[in-house]
Amino acid sequence: MRRMIPITIMTLVLSLLLTPLAFAAIPQGQEEQEEQEQEQSYEETVVVSASRFEQLLMDVPVSISVITGEFIKNSASTGNYADLLRSVPGLNVTQTSARDTNMTSRQATSTLATSQLVMVDGRTVYQDFFGFVLWELLPVNRDELAQIEVQRGPSSAVWGANAMTGVVNVITKSPRAMGNWTSIRAGAGEIGTSFFSALQSGVRDKFSYKFSGAYYQQDPWPRPSNFSGAAFPDAVNRGTAQPKFDGRVDYQINQDSNLSFGGGYTGTNGIIFTGLGPFDIADGSSASYMRADYNNGDANVRFFANILDAESQNLLSPLILNFATGTYDFSAKNMTVAQEGKHVLNYGGNYRHLTNELSIAPDGDTRSEGGVYLQDNWAPHEQFLINAGVRLDTFSSIDGAVFTPRIGMQVRPFAGEDHAIRVSWGRGTRAPSVINNHLNTFIFNSLDLSPLTPVLGFNPGLFAFPIFAEGNPGLKQETHDQFEVGYRAVINGKVSLDFAYYVSETTDNIDFYTDQYFTMFDPPPGWALPGFILNFLPALPKHMTYRNIGSIKNQGMELGFQARVAPGNEIFANYTWQKDPEVEEIDLADVNLPPTNRFNVGMAGSVRGLMYSAVVAYQDEAFWSDVLDSRFHGVTDKMTTLNLTLGYELENINFSVRATNVTNQLFQQHYVGDVIGRRVVAEAGLNFDWDNR
């Protein structure tokens, strides 16, 4: 049953919204008044994720949220993106272990969220071999983040396959924008949390650079009780340890062109949850990348390589998953302005080659894909904007080309005013992963037979049985169509309002299902009891595979509010409503159900050296059915979290205390996930701006 948001939470919401107003009443010195005059207003917010080139947010006919670098700096999040991105409307976020985070736009997420593309400065970190994102492998330092852009809705017409339900683009500051800068940061706290980071940037004539290193570790959250009759060994849940190194060097050839080179390394370990059950990623698992860019005006040519090397052990069965993958991508893009700015044409393409060594999919050793796209932003009138685009992709794993169009229109009903009504339709796709196509392994599961003791006269204990899991090379791509109507307004540059209503349908869903069960006439290997007993037990899977099936229809609404109540101080609130999905040719019991209601409210900023943030997040219960069989399916309770930051900044040094889930409400964000509680950490930092800016 869906419950109302508690009155106490609403009281806290009002308190959070009203508190910053007191700051606005403090008399300001000349310096603060100048800062307020220079502070960027909401109508000046620029994004790049909507069309792969810089646009004012007010000119984008799709739903995009922007998390600013200032908000990131003040947030309670120290080591995971879940606490940070949960405040975005329309984005369902789950944390299932100390290191495992998943998120999906405008539909239920899962243990392996496959439909949301995640990038760092336009470089994908999506793992094509399994179709998921390892968030902790983003090799970026908090101090170098410029902003995070979250586009909700199909983005394949711009970014290609796997941007099916949306895009998260983590954008970092360039070395030249950072200038000559040094930062050192360290902290420690509850749940065995400790972290250290260092960042150095500099500018030397035509050269600019930045280098960073970091280390983060945390003990495990508690595992849930043995609710399913299957073993959940506690000893292997070791938390996580994550070293990171990253670097970038730019060379300014002339005013219009430059070269940029980057590379990084990230290590990880800890629990990752999949449809095959939880795996423990071993020590020494790592990801690395290298990138080279040439920019000339609006033209860009890029090459990047992502390398992943990891080993893992399934916690429910003796299944080893070792994966060594390489992604090699070459892309080019350009932009042309025509008819005195009425048409802005954006076009380009890419070719990608993947190599894989997968212990559970030995036949999926290589894959290639390529695509081209064309976008046109047409402004026939100063109050009317049309965006249309199309992309064509080919995959070595899919017969025929994949066509993804989109179109959007935006009207500003009042000349000279920042009010915009938008209507858009778009299509997104997700290509089958290598595992979807080529999985070939046995999963050893277990069933607790001890309830049969009174009948049998002895305790049969746990019975282990094999399930053969097999891929399907004939899978088609998933297709996601979405229609959206929305409204965006900026009032006096200081207040931003946003509304969106959408309906969507995902067809040819890639579903991992059981197509054969053991029976009394075909019992599992090693079954020593009478065969008829199987008729009184939960059905035991014999064979599992993937299929394209049916459709899932979603609809929902999002409301957003932001306001700058004083220089550097902001309050926000947003609400998300998602209707339970409607399904065809699929049993609703086999579909994850997202929370119906989600609500976020918060504030963040700094006043006379005092830095703070406070965010309350509420969400309803959710249903999960994406892991193995019905023994691992169930409902997670509604939850309310309060995250707080309080600190003080001097000229070159700062101290802060950052707390997540302050009230220590114990909850699971997925039915098989860890039990998440409170974490409080203390942090100290040194910052040196050698340019005295």
Name each model-derived stretch:
Residues A214, N300-N314, K342, R352-T355, ...:
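Membrane-embedded beta-barrel scaffold of Gram-negative outer-membrane proteins
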Residues Q218-P222, R238, S257-D329, S359-I360:
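Flexible loop and strand-edge segments within Gram-negative outer membrane beta-barrel domains
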Residues A157, N169, R176-G179, S183-G187, ...:
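Periplasmic-side early beta-strands and strand-to-turn transitions of outer-membrane beta-barrels
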Residues N254-D256, G262-G263, G267, Y289-Y294, ...:
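Structural signature of Gram-negative outer-membrane beta-barrels, strongest in the C-terminal barrel
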Residues T124-R152, A469:
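Short acidic/polar hinge/loop motifs at secondary-structure boundaries
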Residues F261, A379-I386, D498, Y502-E505, ...:
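Gram-negative outer-membrane beta-barrel transporters
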Residues S49, L56, A82-Q127, A146:
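Extracytoplasmic beta-strand/coil segments of soluble accessory domains associated
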Residues P139-S183:
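A beta-strand signature from Gram-negative outer-membrane beta-barrel systems
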